[in-house]
UniProtKB/Swiss-Prot annotation:
It comes from the Bacteria. Keywords: ATP-binding, Nucleotide-binding, Transport. Gene3D superfamilies: P-loop containing nucleotide triphosphate hydrolases (3.40.50.300). CDD domains: ABC_FeS_Assembly. The keyword Transport applies. This is Vegetative protein 296. The gene is sufC. Disulfide bonds: none annotated. It comes from Bacillus subtilis (strain 168). ATP binds at G38, P39, N40, G41, T42, G43, K44, S45. Residues 6-248 form the ABC transporter domain. Belongs to the ABC transporter superfamily. Ycf16 family. GO terms for molecular function: ATP binding; ATP hydrolysis activity. Coiled coil: none annotated.
């Protein structure tokens, strides 16, 4: 299987008529881990929502392609079937659907008819991954995210990632609200996914996550655009010095785009 490439060119996105993204350019290839950092309200979460096709976010200009195919022409489920995955900051609770049923359906939705994962293979894979993420085996039969703690929801998102094995994953503030032990476990799961067939875009406020998952590229977003990119050392400098030096370097006075995004 050839490595995939997610290409974002000159992406402009509006929400309720207000422009949030103002020309984002990014390329993520299989085998690469990218981090997007930036102050609050600079469009980081808007980027993840636009990639996955959230109906509230209107793309007014630019393109998103996965291996040359137009992602913007795809429905949300088609984006997932094509190999995109979003781990959300606040995952939804779905009553009446067990974790195991949800995961098996999600895996089979990406497969051809007649090529569904066998029940035995699925159970073995799920047991192995839940043990790796130090999850209670009973969580397999609980309703999806219902009554889960914040940490359990985040582990569950990473369990989905490990079970579904997408081509490109977008992790939107997967580290928010996690204590250090949960962060280590979640990071361990993400690092286990590293391969030339898997690319990852991590959206985060904090260097803390990047202490456990070393990014190949760090991007800084301000004013709805990527204003600076560098290696892992860029995140370390941001942790030590904040964002003011970038604002001064680029002559930016107000880094937000007018709302929490």
């Amino acid at each position: 299987m050839a490595a995939s490439t997610l290409t974002i060119k000159d992406l402009h996105v509006e929400i309720e008529g207000k422009e949030i993204l103002k020309g984002v350019n990014l390329e993520i290839k299989g085998g690469e881990f990218h981090a997007v950092m930036g102050p609050n309200g600079t469009g980081k979460s808007t980027l993840s929502a636009a990639i996955m096709g959230h109906p509230k976010y209107e793309v007014t200009k630019g393109s998103i392609t996965l291996d040359g195919k137009d992602v913007l022409e795809m429905e949300v489920d088609e984006r997932a079937q094509a190999g995109l995955f979003l781990a959300m900051q606040y995952p939804s609770e779905i009553s009446g659907v067990t974790n195991a049923d949800f995961l098996r359906s999600a895996i089979n939705a990406r497969r051809e008819e007649g090529d569904e994962i066998s029940l035995m293979k699925f159970i073995r894979k799920m047991d192995e991954n839940m043990e790796f993420l130090e999850m209670d085996p009973e969580m397999a039969q609980r309703y999806l995210n219902e009554g889960f703690s914040g940490g359990e929801k985040k582990r569950n998102e990473i369990l989905q990632l490990m079970m579904i094995e997408p081509k490109i994953a977008i992790l939107d503030e997967i580290d928010s609200g996690l204590d250090i032990d949960a962060l280590k476990v979640v990071s361990k799961g993400i690092n286990k996914m590293r391969s030339e067939n898997f690319g990852c875009l991590m959206i985060t406020h904090y260097q803390r996550l990047l202490n456990y998952i070393t990014p190949d590229v760090v991007h800084v977003m301000m004013q709805g655009r990527v204003v600076k990119s560098g290696g892992a050392e860029l995140a370390q400098r941001l942790e030590a010095e904040g964002y003011d030096w970038i604002k001064q370097e680029l002559g930016i006075e107000d880094e937000t785009v007018g709302q929490e995004a």
